[in-house]
Amino acid sequence: PNERVPEYTKEERQRMQRAFGYTYESLKDSILPMAKNGIEGTSAMGTDTPLAALSGNREPLFNYFKQLFAQVTNPPIDSIREEVVTSTTVYIGAAGNLLEEKPENCKVLRINNPILTNTDLMKIRSMKVEGFKVETISIVYYKNTSLEKAVERLYIEADRAYRDGANILILSDRDVDDNHVAIPSLLAVSALQQYLVKTKKRTSLSMILESGEPREVHHFATLLGFGASAINPYLAQDTVKQLVDEHMLDKDYYAAIDDYNHAIISGIVKIAAKMGISTIQSYQGSKIFEAIGIDKEVIDKYFTNTVSRIGGITIKDIENDVNTLHSAAYDPLGLETDVTLDSKGRHKMR
């Protein structure tokens, strides 16, 4: 990895993994097969695990959303045999006024797929090109303070960046430590997406997420579906480095990262194809999900117009879940904590 990209010690990495809800299964059954084979791990059809709202575990917010699929109107696409009609290319930057054609509208950054390596993000962050201005906004907040207030602060920071001329926002939770907790990445992305739409600023800004939370294909699909333009899963990629260093992967770091990223993007294309969508750009911001077990007030405020037939967790419940995970990684009393990853039995009976 590039020297200028932040790296973690083994203990720091384990604490971050626990803070973001990683389990032993996340490494063994999700990240390892993808980094090893370049495709998602194979498993049996069907699931008998409890819904996230009924689970006794602290489930990530991603798991409260179910993917929809085409049933009547646009037919699904075979993403393998019809790969020629699919595209993973995305464009980052201000979209300009769609009703006024002019050359400035075409000044965007073209990237081959929305899953960024640490080096890719570093290049975008340090870009000094006329017509592009990149601003990083932290999506962490001081522990024991309000998650709802932290989201409101995110709106204020985005408004400030917009006034300063930024057209690319990087939402980053790299500052998580013993005193700072991350806003759940899906909540941060969707809340800001809805705010920018309501204030008529969305087409002037692109959102890139730099987060340690996403690691499975469904996580990335929800983030793109709720408004992210691109995602840098820095902790998942650092976990791949861990697997290489521990000789659980018989390949070099760069090849393993390429295979992991390829598995993620292939999985996203497959999910989009179920709805008859052939390009990632068309899938972005589409919100083709159904929420199960989230309170109506949370849906209306942060996931506006998302299908939701039953209520459930409130913003306070989400805050409590985040704080519980953080306390398991960074003991609030400053005592030594066991940072070994738990096995939750999500993929196999325990």
Feature-to-residue mapping (PLM):
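Non-cysteine beta-strand/loop elements that form the S-adenosyl-L-methionine
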Residues: 229-236
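Short gly/pro/ser/thr-enriched loop/turn and capping motifs at secondary-structure boundaries
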Residues: 237-244
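Short, acidic/small-residue loops that bind anionic groups at enzyme active sites
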Residues: 195, 235, 256
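Flexible, glycine-rich loop/tail regions that form catalytic "lids" or insertion modules at the edges
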Residues: 1-150, 154-161, 165-168, 214, ...
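Conserved structured catalytic cores and adjacent interaction surfaces
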Residues: 143-146, 150-219, 225-227
